[in-house]
Design a protein with these regions (language model features):
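Walker B catalytic acidic pair
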Residues: 361
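Glycine- and charge-rich intrinsically disordered segments
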Residues: 1-54, 560-576
Length: 576
Protein backbone atom coordinates (compact mmCIF):
# COMPACT_ATOMS: atom_id res chain seq x y z
CA UNK A 1 0.00 0.00 0.00
CA UNK A 2 1.38 3.42 -0.93
CA UNK A 3 2.08 6.23 1.52
CA UNK A 4 -0.74 8.26 -0.02
CA UNK A 5 -3.12 5.39 0.74
CA UNK A 6 -1.86 5.38 4.31
CA UNK A 7 -2.94 9.01 4.59
CA UNK A 8 -6.42 8.22 3.21
CA UNK A 9 -6.76 5.28 5.57
CA UNK A 10 -6.08 7.54 8.53
CA UNK A 11 -9.12 9.69 7.72
CA UNK A 12 -11.35 6.66 7.21
CA UNK A 13 -10.10 5.11 10.41
CA UNK A 14 -10.88 8.31 12.29
CA UNK A 15 -14.44 8.33 10.98
CA UNK A 16 -14.88 4.73 12.07
CA UNK A 17 -13.52 5.48 15.52
CA UNK A 18 -15.84 8.49 15.92
CA UNK A 19 -18.93 6.46 14.99
CA UNK A 20 -18.05 3.43 17.14
CA UNK A 21 -19.35 3.23 20.75
CA UNK A 22 -16.68 3.81 23.37
CA UNK A 23 -16.08 0.52 25.15
CA UNK A 24 -12.99 1.35 27.13
CA UNK A 25 -13.20 3.35 30.36
CA UNK A 26 -11.92 6.90 30.40
CA UNK A 27 -8.47 7.37 31.91
CA UNK A 28 -8.03 8.50 35.47
CA UNK A 29 -8.52 12.30 35.59
CA UNK A 30 -5.26 12.55 37.49
CA UNK A 31 -3.41 10.89 34.60
CA UNK A 32 -2.65 13.15 31.61
CA UNK A 33 -3.81 11.93 28.22
CA UNK A 34 -0.93 10.50 26.28
CA UNK A 35 -2.03 12.58 23.34
CA UNK A 36 -1.45 15.76 25.35
CA UNK A 37 2.22 14.88 25.55
CA UNK A 38 2.24 14.79 21.74
CA UNK A 39 0.48 18.14 21.45
CA UNK A 40 -3.09 16.85 21.10
CA UNK A 41 -5.82 17.25 23.68
CA UNK A 42 -9.13 15.67 22.74
CA UNK A 43 -10.45 15.47 26.31
CA UNK A 44 -12.69 18.52 25.81
CA UNK A 45 -13.90 17.56 22.34
CA UNK A 46 -17.72 17.39 22.14
CA UNK A 47 -19.03 13.86 21.76
CA UNK A 48 -21.23 14.94 18.84
CA UNK A 49 -18.37 16.40 16.83
CA UNK A 50 -19.13 16.88 13.15
CA UNK A 51 -16.21 15.18 11.38
CA UNK A 52 -17.10 16.79 8.06
CA UNK A 53 -16.70 20.18 9.74
CA UNK A 54 -13.33 19.09 11.14
CA UNK A 55 -12.26 18.12 7.63
CA UNK A 56 -13.37 21.50 6.25
CA UNK A 57 -11.51 23.40 8.96
CA UNK A 58 -8.29 21.51 8.24
CA UNK A 59 -7.66 23.96 5.39
CA UNK A 60 -7.63 26.95 7.78
CA UNK A 61 -4.44 28.45 9.16
CA UNK A 62 -3.16 29.03 12.69
CA UNK A 63 -4.39 32.62 13.08
CA UNK A 64 -6.93 33.98 15.58
CA UNK A 65 -9.11 35.00 12.64
CA UNK A 66 -9.32 31.43 11.38
CA UNK A 67 -9.94 30.20 14.91
CA UNK A 68 -12.94 32.52 14.90
CA UNK A 69 -14.04 30.83 11.66
CA UNK A 70 -13.60 27.43 13.29
CA UNK A 71 -15.78 28.49 16.20
CA UNK A 72 -18.51 29.68 13.84
CA UNK A 73 -18.29 26.54 11.69
CA UNK A 74 -18.56 24.15 14.62
CA UNK A 75 -20.82 26.04 17.06
CA UNK A 76 -21.94 29.22 15.34
CA UNK A 77 -25.58 28.18 15.54
CA UNK A 78 -25.35 28.25 19.34
CA UNK A 79 -23.71 31.67 19.67
CA UNK A 80 -24.95 35.21 19.15
CA UNK A 81 -23.61 38.62 20.03
CA UNK A 82 -26.09 41.20 21.28
CA UNK A 83 -25.28 44.29 19.28
CA UNK A 84 -24.57 47.52 21.17
CA UNK A 85 -23.52 50.97 20.02
CA UNK A 86 -20.25 52.45 21.18
CA UNK A 87 -18.76 49.29 22.64
CA UNK A 88 -16.30 46.70 21.44
CA UNK A 89 -17.15 44.37 24.34
CA UNK A 90 -19.49 41.68 23.14
CA UNK A 91 -22.52 40.73 25.18
CA UNK A 92 -22.88 37.06 24.40
CA UNK A 93 -26.00 34.93 24.23
CA UNK A 94 -25.75 31.14 24.05
CA UNK A 95 -28.44 28.68 22.98
CA UNK A 96 -29.11 26.23 25.80
CA UNK A 97 -31.55 24.03 23.91
CA UNK A 98 -34.69 25.95 24.88
CA UNK A 99 -33.84 29.65 24.82
CA UNK A 100 -30.97 32.08 24.34
CA UNK A 101 -29.16 32.42 27.66
CA UNK A 102 -28.01 36.01 28.17
CA UNK A 103 -27.46 36.06 31.93
CA UNK A 104 -24.75 33.38 31.65
CA UNK A 105 -24.00 34.05 28.00
CA UNK A 106 -20.37 35.04 28.49
CA UNK A 107 -19.59 31.89 30.49
CA UNK A 108 -21.44 29.69 28.03
CA UNK A 109 -19.62 31.27 25.09
CA UNK A 110 -16.27 30.62 26.76
CA UNK A 111 -17.25 27.02 27.50
CA UNK A 112 -18.18 26.53 23.85
CA UNK A 113 -14.90 28.06 22.70
CA UNK A 114 -13.01 25.65 24.95
CA UNK A 115 -14.26 22.71 22.86
CA UNK A 116 -12.59 23.98 19.69
CA UNK A 117 -9.01 23.14 20.69
CA UNK A 118 -9.71 19.42 20.74
CA UNK A 119 -11.34 19.63 17.32
CA UNK A 120 -8.32 21.47 15.94
CA UNK A 121 -6.17 18.55 17.07
CA UNK A 122 -8.34 16.21 14.99
CA UNK A 123 -7.70 18.32 11.89
CA UNK A 124 -4.17 16.89 11.76
CA UNK A 125 -5.51 13.62 10.35
CA UNK A 126 -7.11 15.49 7.46
CA UNK A 127 -3.99 17.33 6.42
CA UNK A 128 -2.65 16.07 3.10
CA UNK A 129 0.54 16.24 1.12
CA UNK A 130 1.35 19.23 -1.02
CA UNK A 131 1.46 18.73 -4.81
CA UNK A 132 5.30 18.52 -4.84
CA UNK A 133 5.18 15.98 -2.01
CA UNK A 134 2.61 13.91 -3.88
CA UNK A 135 4.82 14.02 -6.96
CA UNK A 136 7.82 12.83 -4.93
CA UNK A 137 5.81 9.96 -3.45
CA UNK A 138 4.53 8.86 -6.87
CA UNK A 139 8.04 9.04 -8.31
CA UNK A 140 9.42 6.90 -5.45
CA UNK A 141 6.70 4.33 -6.11
CA UNK A 142 7.82 4.09 -9.74
CA UNK A 143 11.57 4.14 -9.07
CA UNK A 144 12.09 1.81 -6.15
CA UNK A 145 15.86 1.62 -6.70
CA UNK A 146 16.32 5.41 -6.91
CA UNK A 147 17.79 6.42 -3.57
CA UNK A 148 17.18 10.12 -4.21
CA UNK A 149 13.55 9.41 -5.01
CA UNK A 150 13.16 7.34 -1.85
CA UNK A 151 14.81 10.10 0.20
CA UNK A 152 12.45 12.65 -1.31
CA UNK A 153 9.51 10.42 -0.40
CA UNK A 154 10.74 10.12 3.18
CA UNK A 155 11.15 13.90 3.35
CA UNK A 156 7.60 14.38 2.07
CA UNK A 157 6.21 12.03 4.69
CA UNK A 158 8.25 13.74 7.41
CA UNK A 159 7.02 17.16 6.26
CA UNK A 160 3.40 16.07 6.57
CA UNK A 161 4.02 14.56 9.98
CA UNK A 162 5.65 17.82 11.06
CA UNK A 163 2.63 19.83 9.91
CA UNK A 164 0.35 17.40 11.70
CA UNK A 165 2.36 17.82 14.88
CA UNK A 166 2.17 21.58 14.59
CA UNK A 167 -1.59 21.42 14.07
CA UNK A 168 -2.01 19.28 17.18
CA UNK A 169 0.20 21.65 19.15
CA UNK A 170 -1.83 24.58 17.87
CA UNK A 171 -4.97 22.82 19.07
CA UNK A 172 -3.52 22.72 22.58
CA UNK A 173 -2.39 26.35 22.50
CA UNK A 174 -5.86 27.34 21.29
CA UNK A 175 -7.17 26.29 24.70
CA UNK A 176 -5.17 29.02 26.42
CA UNK A 177 -7.00 32.05 27.76
CA UNK A 178 -5.54 34.57 25.33
CA UNK A 179 -6.34 32.36 22.33
CA UNK A 180 -9.87 31.70 23.60
CA UNK A 181 -10.60 35.40 24.05
CA UNK A 182 -9.11 36.17 20.65
CA UNK A 183 -11.21 33.41 19.07
CA UNK A 184 -14.39 34.90 20.53
CA UNK A 185 -13.40 38.44 19.55
CA UNK A 186 -12.78 37.38 15.95
CA UNK A 187 -16.09 35.52 15.76
CA UNK A 188 -18.15 38.30 17.37
CA UNK A 189 -18.61 40.57 14.31
CA UNK A 190 -20.01 37.66 12.30
CA UNK A 191 -22.77 36.64 14.73
CA UNK A 192 -24.10 40.04 15.82
CA UNK A 193 -27.87 40.31 16.25
CA UNK A 194 -29.65 43.67 16.34
CA UNK A 195 -31.59 44.55 19.52
CA UNK A 196 -34.93 44.67 17.71
CA UNK A 197 -34.54 41.05 16.59
CA UNK A 198 -34.57 39.72 20.15
CA UNK A 199 -37.95 38.71 21.62
CA UNK A 200 -39.71 40.27 18.63
CA UNK A 201 -42.72 37.92 18.64
CA UNK A 202 -44.99 39.66 21.15
CA UNK A 203 -47.58 36.88 21.27
CA UNK A 204 -45.11 34.04 21.73
CA UNK A 205 -44.38 32.53 25.16
CA UNK A 206 -41.73 29.94 25.95
CA UNK A 207 -42.58 27.48 28.72
CA UNK A 208 -40.79 24.48 30.15
CA UNK A 209 -42.29 21.91 27.80
CA UNK A 210 -42.84 23.93 24.63
CA UNK A 211 -44.22 27.19 23.28
CA UNK A 212 -47.54 28.98 23.53
CA UNK A 213 -48.76 31.34 20.82
CA UNK A 214 -51.71 33.62 21.52
CA UNK A 215 -53.92 34.28 18.51
CA UNK A 216 -56.64 36.92 18.19
CA UNK A 217 -59.27 36.47 15.52
CA UNK A 218 -62.78 37.57 14.64
CA UNK A 219 -65.53 35.77 16.51
CA UNK A 220 -68.27 34.66 14.09
CA UNK A 221 -70.56 33.73 16.98
CA UNK A 222 -70.87 37.34 18.15
CA UNK A 223 -72.72 39.88 16.04
CA UNK A 224 -72.84 43.65 16.19
CA UNK A 225 -71.94 46.81 14.38
CA UNK A 226 -68.32 46.48 15.43
CA UNK A 227 -66.22 43.43 14.70
CA UNK A 228 -66.08 41.04 17.65
CA UNK A 229 -62.94 39.14 18.49
CA UNK A 230 -61.90 36.16 20.53
CA UNK A 231 -58.58 34.70 21.51
CA UNK A 232 -57.17 31.21 21.63
CA UNK A 233 -53.82 29.68 22.40
CA UNK A 234 -51.79 27.19 20.38
CA UNK A 235 -49.33 24.90 22.17
CA UNK A 236 -46.35 23.38 20.36
CA UNK A 237 -44.54 20.71 22.41
CA UNK A 238 -40.79 21.35 22.42
CA UNK A 239 -41.35 24.14 19.91
CA UNK A 240 -38.34 26.22 20.92
CA UNK A 241 -36.43 27.63 17.94
CA UNK A 242 -33.17 29.51 17.69
CA UNK A 243 -34.63 31.84 15.07
CA UNK A 244 -37.24 33.15 17.52
CA UNK A 245 -34.41 34.85 19.44
CA UNK A 246 -36.23 34.38 22.74
CA UNK A 247 -34.07 35.10 25.79
CA UNK A 248 -36.41 34.13 28.65
CA UNK A 249 -38.52 31.12 29.52
CA UNK A 250 -41.29 30.66 32.09
CA UNK A 251 -40.20 27.74 34.30
CA UNK A 252 -43.63 26.11 34.23
CA UNK A 253 -44.84 23.18 32.13
CA UNK A 254 -48.09 23.86 30.29
CA UNK A 255 -50.91 21.50 31.23
CA UNK A 256 -54.32 22.58 29.93
CA UNK A 257 -56.03 20.50 32.62
CA UNK A 258 -54.09 21.92 35.58
CA UNK A 259 -56.11 23.67 38.30
CA UNK A 260 -55.26 26.16 41.05
CA UNK A 261 -58.14 26.06 43.57
CA UNK A 262 -56.14 27.52 46.46
CA UNK A 263 -54.86 30.40 44.37
CA UNK A 264 -58.35 31.19 43.04
CA UNK A 265 -59.75 31.11 46.58
CA UNK A 266 -56.95 33.45 47.67
CA UNK A 267 -57.79 35.99 44.95
CA UNK A 268 -61.52 35.73 45.69
CA UNK A 269 -60.93 36.33 49.39
CA UNK A 270 -58.69 39.37 49.11
CA UNK A 271 -60.29 40.97 46.04
CA UNK A 272 -63.91 40.00 46.76
CA UNK A 273 -66.52 40.84 44.17
CA UNK A 274 -68.91 42.13 46.83
CA UNK A 275 -66.41 44.69 48.15
CA UNK A 276 -64.45 45.68 45.03
CA UNK A 277 -66.56 44.51 42.07
CA UNK A 278 -64.65 43.86 38.87
CA UNK A 279 -61.21 44.35 40.40
CA UNK A 280 -60.21 40.67 40.47
CA UNK A 281 -61.19 40.36 36.80
CA UNK A 282 -59.16 43.43 35.80
CA UNK A 283 -56.15 42.15 37.74
CA UNK A 284 -56.43 38.74 36.06
CA UNK A 285 -56.58 40.32 32.60
CA UNK A 286 -53.63 42.64 33.25
CA UNK A 287 -51.53 39.83 34.70
CA UNK A 288 -52.52 37.53 31.84
CA UNK A 289 -51.56 40.23 29.37
CA UNK A 290 -48.11 39.91 30.93
CA UNK A 291 -47.69 36.56 29.20
CA UNK A 292 -47.23 38.57 26.01
CA UNK A 293 -45.11 41.50 24.94
CA UNK A 294 -48.10 43.61 23.89
CA UNK A 295 -47.42 47.14 25.22
CA UNK A 296 -49.98 48.84 27.43
CA UNK A 297 -49.71 52.29 29.00
CA UNK A 298 -50.65 51.25 32.51
CA UNK A 299 -48.89 50.68 35.79
CA UNK A 300 -50.80 48.70 38.43
CA UNK A 301 -50.24 50.14 41.91
CA UNK A 302 -51.38 47.64 44.53
CA UNK A 303 -52.44 49.78 47.48
CA UNK A 304 -53.53 48.87 50.97
CA UNK A 305 -52.45 48.50 54.57
CA UNK A 306 -50.49 45.47 55.72
CA UNK A 307 -51.78 41.89 56.02
CA UNK A 308 -54.05 42.26 52.99
CA UNK A 309 -52.59 39.68 50.60
CA UNK A 310 -51.03 41.99 48.01
CA UNK A 311 -47.41 41.06 48.83
CA UNK A 312 -48.19 37.33 48.74
CA UNK A 313 -50.02 37.73 45.44
CA UNK A 314 -47.12 39.57 43.76
CA UNK A 315 -44.51 37.19 45.17
CA UNK A 316 -46.42 34.16 43.87
CA UNK A 317 -46.64 35.69 40.40
CA UNK A 318 -42.95 36.61 40.47
CA UNK A 319 -42.01 32.99 41.17
CA UNK A 320 -44.38 31.61 38.55
CA UNK A 321 -42.98 33.96 35.93
CA UNK A 322 -39.44 33.07 37.02
CA UNK A 323 -36.81 34.40 34.61
CA UNK A 324 -39.60 35.93 32.55
CA UNK A 325 -40.01 38.43 35.39
CA UNK A 326 -37.63 40.89 36.92
CA UNK A 327 -37.52 43.08 40.01
CA UNK A 328 -36.72 46.77 40.05
CA UNK A 329 -35.68 48.46 43.30
CA UNK A 330 -37.85 51.33 44.45
CA UNK A 331 -34.81 53.62 44.28
CA UNK A 332 -34.84 53.25 40.50
CA UNK A 333 -38.14 55.10 40.09
CA UNK A 334 -38.34 57.25 43.23
CA UNK A 335 -36.32 60.16 44.56
CA UNK A 336 -35.09 63.33 42.96
CA UNK A 337 -31.87 62.02 41.39
CA UNK A 338 -32.28 61.47 37.68
CA UNK A 339 -28.75 60.24 37.00
CA UNK A 340 -26.17 61.76 34.73
CA UNK A 341 -27.17 62.28 31.13
CA UNK A 342 -25.98 59.28 29.17
CA UNK A 343 -24.95 57.51 32.36
CA UNK A 344 -25.06 53.78 32.83
CA UNK A 345 -28.46 52.29 33.69
CA UNK A 346 -27.68 48.66 34.56
CA UNK A 347 -31.00 48.22 36.37
CA UNK A 348 -32.88 49.09 33.18
CA UNK A 349 -30.47 47.17 30.93
CA UNK A 350 -31.77 43.95 32.56
CA UNK A 351 -35.31 44.51 31.29
CA UNK A 352 -35.27 43.41 27.61
CA UNK A 353 -37.47 40.34 27.21
CA UNK A 354 -39.09 40.79 30.63
CA UNK A 355 -42.86 40.30 30.71
CA UNK A 356 -43.55 40.81 34.45
CA UNK A 357 -41.90 43.75 36.23
CA UNK A 358 -42.25 44.03 39.97
CA UNK A 359 -41.17 47.26 41.62
CA UNK A 360 -40.38 46.70 45.28
CA UNK A 361 -42.43 48.27 48.08
CA UNK A 362 -42.45 52.03 47.66
CA UNK A 363 -41.83 54.39 50.57
CA UNK A 364 -44.81 56.61 51.32
CA UNK A 365 -44.47 60.19 50.15
CA UNK A 366 -41.27 59.60 48.19
CA UNK A 367 -41.46 61.52 44.89
CA UNK A 368 -41.98 59.34 41.86
CA UNK A 369 -39.67 59.83 38.88
CA UNK A 370 -42.54 60.58 36.57
CA UNK A 371 -40.51 60.86 33.37
CA UNK A 372 -39.08 57.38 33.93
CA UNK A 373 -42.50 55.91 34.71
CA UNK A 374 -43.76 57.33 31.41
CA UNK A 375 -40.82 55.75 29.58
CA UNK A 376 -41.37 52.38 31.24
CA UNK A 377 -45.04 52.34 30.30
CA UNK A 378 -44.94 54.37 27.08
CA UNK A 379 -44.78 51.56 24.55
CA UNK A 380 -41.86 53.24 22.79
CA UNK A 381 -38.21 52.24 22.59
CA UNK A 382 -35.92 53.07 25.49
CA UNK A 383 -32.22 53.83 25.19
CA UNK A 384 -30.17 52.28 27.98
CA UNK A 385 -26.48 51.79 28.60
CA UNK A 386 -24.88 48.75 30.16
CA UNK A 387 -22.16 49.15 32.75
CA UNK A 388 -18.75 49.67 31.08
CA UNK A 389 -20.29 48.81 27.71
CA UNK A 390 -22.38 50.50 25.04
CA UNK A 391 -25.89 51.69 24.31
CA UNK A 392 -28.80 49.77 22.94
CA UNK A 393 -32.50 50.44 22.49
CA UNK A 394 -35.34 48.10 23.37
CA UNK A 395 -39.10 48.30 23.48
CA UNK A 396 -40.51 47.50 26.93
CA UNK A 397 -42.78 44.47 26.86
CA UNK A 398 -43.40 44.05 30.57
CA UNK A 399 -46.49 44.81 32.59
CA UNK A 400 -45.38 46.81 35.61
CA UNK A 401 -46.65 46.26 39.15
CA UNK A 402 -45.72 48.22 42.25
CA UNK A 403 -47.14 48.19 45.74
CA UNK A 404 -47.17 50.19 48.92
CA UNK A 405 -49.01 50.93 52.13
CA UNK A 406 -49.00 54.61 51.17
CA UNK A 407 -48.93 56.60 47.98
CA UNK A 408 -45.67 57.83 46.45
CA UNK A 409 -45.73 61.53 45.68
CA UNK A 410 -46.66 62.64 42.16
CA UNK A 411 -46.00 66.33 41.58
CA UNK A 412 -47.16 66.52 37.97
CA UNK A 413 -50.65 67.64 37.09
CA UNK A 414 -50.70 66.49 33.47
CA UNK A 415 -52.77 63.54 32.35
CA UNK A 416 -49.69 61.81 30.94
CA UNK A 417 -48.75 60.38 34.32
CA UNK A 418 -52.20 60.02 35.85
CA UNK A 419 -53.77 58.02 33.03
CA UNK A 420 -51.03 55.43 33.56
CA UNK A 421 -51.72 54.96 37.27
CA UNK A 422 -54.18 52.11 37.88
CA UNK A 423 -54.79 51.68 41.61
CA UNK A 424 -55.75 48.21 42.87
CA UNK A 425 -57.46 48.59 46.28
CA UNK A 426 -56.66 45.72 48.62
CA UNK A 427 -59.21 46.38 51.37
CA UNK A 428 -59.42 43.03 53.17
CA UNK A 429 -57.23 42.64 56.25
CA UNK A 430 -56.34 39.23 57.66
CA UNK A 431 -57.24 38.91 61.37
CA UNK A 432 -54.15 38.34 63.54
CA UNK A 433 -55.29 34.87 64.56
CA UNK A 434 -55.49 33.80 60.88
CA UNK A 435 -52.13 35.16 59.78
CA UNK A 436 -49.61 32.53 58.62
CA UNK A 437 -45.93 32.56 57.76
CA UNK A 438 -45.36 34.45 54.51
CA UNK A 439 -43.06 31.86 52.95
CA UNK A 440 -45.39 29.02 53.92
CA UNK A 441 -48.33 30.63 52.12
CA UNK A 442 -46.28 31.54 49.04
CA UNK A 443 -44.83 28.04 48.73
CA UNK A 444 -48.28 26.48 49.06
CA UNK A 445 -49.67 28.63 46.24
CA UNK A 446 -46.64 28.33 43.94
CA UNK A 447 -47.13 24.56 44.04
CA UNK A 448 -50.14 25.24 41.80
CA UNK A 449 -47.96 26.96 39.17
CA UNK A 450 -49.34 25.03 36.13
CA UNK A 451 -52.86 25.94 37.20
CA UNK A 452 -51.85 29.56 37.81
CA UNK A 453 -50.47 29.61 34.26
CA UNK A 454 -53.94 28.57 33.05
CA UNK A 455 -55.45 31.37 35.19
CA UNK A 456 -53.12 33.80 33.44
CA UNK A 457 -54.02 32.36 30.03
CA UNK A 458 -57.70 32.93 30.86
CA UNK A 459 -56.86 36.57 31.50
CA UNK A 460 -55.02 36.92 28.20
CA UNK A 461 -57.84 35.32 26.23
CA UNK A 462 -60.29 37.65 27.98
CA UNK A 463 -58.16 40.60 26.87
CA UNK A 464 -58.34 39.45 23.27
CA UNK A 465 -62.10 39.13 23.54
CA UNK A 466 -63.12 42.12 25.63
CA UNK A 467 -60.04 44.25 26.24
CA UNK A 468 -59.04 45.69 29.60
CA UNK A 469 -61.61 47.97 31.21
CA UNK A 470 -60.87 49.32 34.67
CA UNK A 471 -63.84 48.88 37.02
CA UNK A 472 -65.33 51.83 38.96
CA UNK A 473 -63.60 50.70 42.16
CA UNK A 474 -60.19 51.17 40.51
CA UNK A 475 -61.20 54.40 38.75
CA UNK A 476 -62.40 55.86 42.06
CA UNK A 477 -59.24 54.74 43.85
CA UNK A 478 -57.08 56.43 41.21
CA UNK A 479 -59.19 59.59 41.50
CA UNK A 480 -58.73 59.64 45.27
CA UNK A 481 -54.99 59.26 44.73
CA UNK A 482 -54.91 62.14 42.27
CA UNK A 483 -57.05 64.34 44.50
CA UNK A 484 -54.61 63.74 47.33
CA UNK A 485 -51.54 64.43 45.20
CA UNK A 486 -52.90 67.24 43.00
CA UNK A 487 -55.36 69.39 44.98
CA UNK A 488 -54.87 72.36 42.64
CA UNK A 489 -56.29 70.37 39.74
CA UNK A 490 -59.22 69.38 41.95
CA UNK A 491 -59.85 73.07 42.69
CA UNK A 492 -59.67 73.85 38.96
CA UNK A 493 -62.11 71.07 38.11
CA UNK A 494 -64.61 72.25 40.72
CA UNK A 495 -64.25 76.03 40.77
CA UNK A 496 -62.80 77.22 37.44
CA UNK A 497 -64.50 77.22 34.06
CA UNK A 498 -63.61 78.57 30.65
CA UNK A 499 -65.37 81.75 29.53
CA UNK A 500 -63.78 83.81 26.74
CA UNK A 501 -66.07 86.75 27.61
CA UNK A 502 -65.20 86.86 31.31
CA UNK A 503 -63.26 89.69 32.90
CA UNK A 504 -59.57 88.94 33.62
CA UNK A 505 -58.96 87.40 37.03
CA UNK A 506 -56.10 88.66 39.16
CA UNK A 507 -53.64 85.89 40.00
CA UNK A 508 -53.59 86.94 43.66
CA UNK A 509 -57.39 86.80 43.85
CA UNK A 510 -57.40 83.35 42.23
CA UNK A 511 -54.92 82.12 44.83
CA UNK A 512 -56.99 83.59 47.67
CA UNK A 513 -60.03 81.74 46.34
CA UNK A 514 -57.99 78.53 46.17
CA UNK A 515 -56.85 79.06 49.78
CA UNK A 516 -60.45 79.57 50.93
CA UNK A 517 -61.53 76.42 49.08
CA UNK A 518 -58.66 74.47 50.67
CA UNK A 519 -59.59 75.68 54.16
CA UNK A 520 -63.21 74.73 53.73
CA UNK A 521 -62.30 71.28 52.43
CA UNK A 522 -59.85 70.49 55.21
CA UNK A 523 -56.78 70.79 53.00
CA UNK A 524 -53.56 72.67 53.50
CA UNK A 525 -53.13 75.07 50.57
CA UNK A 526 -49.99 74.68 48.52
CA UNK A 527 -47.70 77.63 47.91
CA UNK A 528 -48.71 80.53 45.70
CA UNK A 529 -45.71 79.78 43.48
CA UNK A 530 -46.83 76.24 42.78
CA UNK A 531 -50.43 77.36 42.31
CA UNK A 532 -49.33 79.92 39.76
CA UNK A 533 -47.21 77.36 37.92
CA UNK A 534 -50.13 74.94 37.54
CA UNK A 535 -52.59 77.67 36.56
CA UNK A 536 -50.11 79.07 34.06
CA UNK A 537 -49.85 75.66 32.41
CA UNK A 538 -53.62 75.39 32.08
CA UNK A 539 -54.72 78.93 31.24
CA UNK A 540 -53.50 82.10 29.57
CA UNK A 541 -51.64 84.41 31.96
CA UNK A 542 -50.25 87.87 31.22
CA UNK A 543 -48.87 90.73 33.23
CA UNK A 544 -51.09 93.83 33.10
CA UNK A 545 -50.16 97.00 35.01
CA UNK A 546 -47.62 95.09 37.13
CA UNK A 547 -50.21 92.48 38.07
CA UNK A 548 -50.50 88.92 36.79
CA UNK A 549 -53.89 88.23 35.26
CA UNK A 550 -55.64 85.10 33.96
CA UNK A 551 -57.71 85.46 30.80
CA UNK A 552 -60.64 83.43 29.49
CA UNK A 553 -61.70 81.94 32.84
CA UNK A 554 -64.12 82.67 35.64
CA UNK A 555 -64.30 81.41 39.21
CA UNK A 556 -67.45 79.88 40.63
CA UNK A 557 -68.74 78.06 43.72
CA UNK A 558 -66.10 79.61 45.97
CA UNK A 559 -67.21 79.03 49.56
CA UNK A 560 -67.24 81.99 51.94
CA UNK A 561 -64.21 82.19 54.17
CA UNK A 562 -64.90 80.83 57.61
CA UNK A 563 -64.37 82.96 60.67
CA UNK A 564 -61.49 80.83 61.91
CA UNK A 565 -58.12 82.66 61.97
CA UNK A 566 -55.66 81.89 59.19
CA UNK A 567 -52.65 79.81 60.25
CA UNK A 568 -49.63 82.10 59.79
CA UNK A 569 -47.49 79.07 58.91
CA UNK A 570 -49.60 78.27 55.85
CA UNK A 571 -47.89 78.96 52.53
CA UNK A 572 -48.89 81.79 50.26
CA UNK A 573 -46.42 84.60 50.80
CA UNK A 574 -44.67 84.36 47.42
CA UNK A 575 -46.21 85.59 44.18
CA UNK A 576 -46.44 83.44 41.04
Amino acid sequence: MSDQSDSDLSAETLRAIMSRPVAEPLPDPATPFEAEEDGDGPSDMPVDADISAVEECASLDHSDTDNGRRLLRHRGADLARMQETGSDKATWAAWDGKFWDVSDGAFQALAIAQTIGGLIGLEADFLGHTPPENAAIRKAARELDNKDAQAAKDAAIAALEKRQGKRRAFGVSSKNSARLNAMLACAAPHCAVKPEEWNAAQRLLYVENGTLRFIREEDPDRSGEQAAFKGHVEFTPEGWRRDDRVTRLMPVAYDPKAQCPKFRDFVARFLPEALVPGVARAVQIFCGLGLTGIPVQLLFFHYGLGANGKSVFLEVLARVYGALGEGLPAESITGQAQGAAGGASPDLARLPGVRFLRITELPQGEPLREALVKRLTGGEKMDVRTLFKGYFAFQPQFKAHMSGNGYPSIMGSDNGIWRRMAVVPWKVTIPPDEQRDFEEVVTELVAEAPGILNWLIEGMLAFDGEGLKLPPAMVDAAKDYRDEMDPISVFIDRCVRLNPEAEPVRARHAYECYSIWSDENGRKPLSETRFGRVMGQRFERREVSSANMYFGIELHDIPPRSARPRNPDEPGSDRP
